[in-house]
Amino acid sequence: SAGKFIVIFKNGVSDDKIRETKDEVIAEGGTITNEYNMPGMKGFAGELTPQSLTKFQGLQGDLIDSIEEDGIVTTQ
């Protein structure tokens, strides 16, 4: 896998589109480990394959608000 990422959708993306996107992650061999469904923040955490990651990077600004690597953030 490309690694663990948190994918946040833009406001106004339909639940159907979000479900479809998560299904694609699984179909491509990735996993969904957590889902976020709060007012103003919908998305998921999971392990993405390199092809899913590339596809999502192409959707940024359109469907996806942000993609962040899911890891422990350390500050120096």
Swiss-Prot record:
The modification N-acetylserine is found at residue 1. InterPro entries: PBI_I9 (IPR052471), S8pro/Inhibitor_I9_sf (IPR037045). The keyword rRNA processing does not apply. One of its GO terms (biological process) is vacuole fusion, non-autophagic. Signal peptide: none annotated. One of its GO terms (molecular function) is serine-type endopeptidase inhibitor activity. Disulfide bonds: none annotated. Keywords: Acetylation, Protease inhibitor, Serine protease inhibitor. Transmembrane segments: none annotated. It comes from the Eukaryota. Specifically inhibits an intracellular serine proteinase (proteinase A). Belongs to the protease inhibitor I9 family. This is Serine proteinase inhibitor IA-2. It comes from Pleurotus ostreatus (Oyster mushroom).
